[in-house]
Amino acid sequence: MFRKVLFGRIAGKRRQDMATAGQYAENRAEDSAADHRSGDPAKIFLAEPEVHHPLDADFAIALVLEIAEDLGDAEHANRDGDEIDAFGKFHLSEGEPFLAGIDVLPDRAEKQAHDDHPERLQNRSVRQRNGDKKTEHDQCEIFRCSELQRHRGERRSGNCQQQGRHATGEERAECGRRQRLSGSALAGHLVAIDRRHGRRTLSWQVDQNGRGRAAILGTIIDARQHDQRGDRRKGEGDRQKHGDRRGRPDARKNADQRPQQDADEAPDDVDRSKSCLEAE
């Protein structure tokens, strides 16, 4: 009753003709207010004074609350009270793809594959390079060992040949000092004999190159050669100087000339089989 009196012009609006929130609110409101207002004026009734009732205050409060509720319904003409929460929904939908991208990680898997591929190739190349160096090093060691053995064998054989060919001359030249001391002879080849004035020579036989004189512990043919008296010293010197014309030097000068000449006259074939056995 009071609603019709107070809101007679507003109550005539139909909900399908009311303006929706956010769509041409001004135009639809003017058209609706002019076309659908009530044509009859408000009726006035005569009433008598009434005694105030305690429930009238409660009724008035309820009326005010109802009016406020109706105004709230007018703001939401489509009866969709969740439209205001649409922004929050879009915000949540934008966050979901971001989380999905972190879980999938397609780019990280591809990058890991590219990183592992060159690492395998590098390890392979390193192994091949180390293998080549190892082979060259082993060959170098083998050739070096063979060269050392070859040089050692050549040096040993050269020493054996030198001892076998020129041993007689060198030993005789080294032993032919001015003191003219007799030395030990080689077994079965060279024999040291005692010559005049303590001079010794090396010969193949006991009396070879002896010039007809006696060897050690032999019979003295000419006793005058061993006479060391003062009056015959000059004669022995003359006899020694002129008696042997075969190039033998005097006992008092050029003592090392004859041993060097005899060293050159030594035979070349001095038991080569012995030197070869030592080389092996």
Swiss-Prot record:
The keyword Ubl conjugation does not apply. Residues 110-137, 151-177, 219-280 are annotated as: Disordered. Residues 110-122, 167-177, 223-261, 269-280 have a biased composition (Basic and acidic residues). Coiled coil: none annotated. Keywords: Plasmid. This is Uncharacterized 31.6 kDa protein in TAR-I ttuC' 3'region.
